[in-house]
């Protein structure tokens, strides 16, 4: 695949959408498809049942716990998770279920840093923190967040170094103005 040719020695985990697989068989098929085009592993928001099927098929899987944006309407909205004892235990159990299912890593999103420190000490999974502070094994941010690519509200865990959204809005206004001038010229 072209991406592998461009970066032959780079570890790549491809993200597979939550709703892309409706069965364990589809989860395995999607994992193999990602690997056939260059993935070393896949990142997913799947249930432990789907993670287990893919892991048993030899596909390295990174699960997702804490705030899962795609599931946020089911879990109380886009907000920090794990601030109460019940939520902290829920996050821990989610991570342990992914571990038992055979995942090698978990993306843990928007939980208290101290909770992630404690969980990281109690799991064999590689913990990847986004909005969980330095409590994980890895800390990352999305370029679209640090560059302000989308309209507010912005994630609180990410500083916006640029406002690309504003620039895109200005470009669109210029585009519309340019077409209006063109239309006036050809009338």
Residue ranges and their predicted role:
Residues 1-187:
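Alpha/beta enzyme core
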């Amino acid at each position: 695949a072209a991406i592998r040719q461009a970066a032959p020695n780079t570890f790549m985990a491809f993200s597979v959408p939550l709703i892309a697989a409706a069965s364990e068989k589809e989860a395995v098929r999607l994992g193999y498809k990602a690997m056939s085009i260059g993935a070393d592993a896949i990142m997913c928001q799947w249930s432990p049942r789907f993670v287990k099927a893919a892991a048993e098929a030899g596909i390295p899987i990174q699960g997702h716990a804490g705030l899962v944006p795609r599931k946020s309407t089911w879990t109380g909205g886009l907000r920090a998770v794990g601030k109460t004892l019940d939520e902290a235990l829920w996050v821990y159990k989610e991570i342990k279920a992914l571990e038992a299912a055979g995942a090698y890593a978990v993306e843990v999103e928007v939980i208290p840093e101290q909770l992630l420190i404690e969980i990281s000490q109690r799991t064999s999974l590689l913990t990847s923190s986004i909005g969980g502070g330095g409590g994980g094994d890895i800390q990352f941010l999305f370029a679209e967040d640090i560059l302000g690519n989308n309209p507010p509200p912005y994630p609180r865990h990410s500083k916006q170094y640029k406002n690309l959204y504003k620039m895109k809005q200005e470009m669109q206004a210029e585009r519309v103005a340019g077409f209006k001038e063109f239309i006036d010229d050809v009338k």
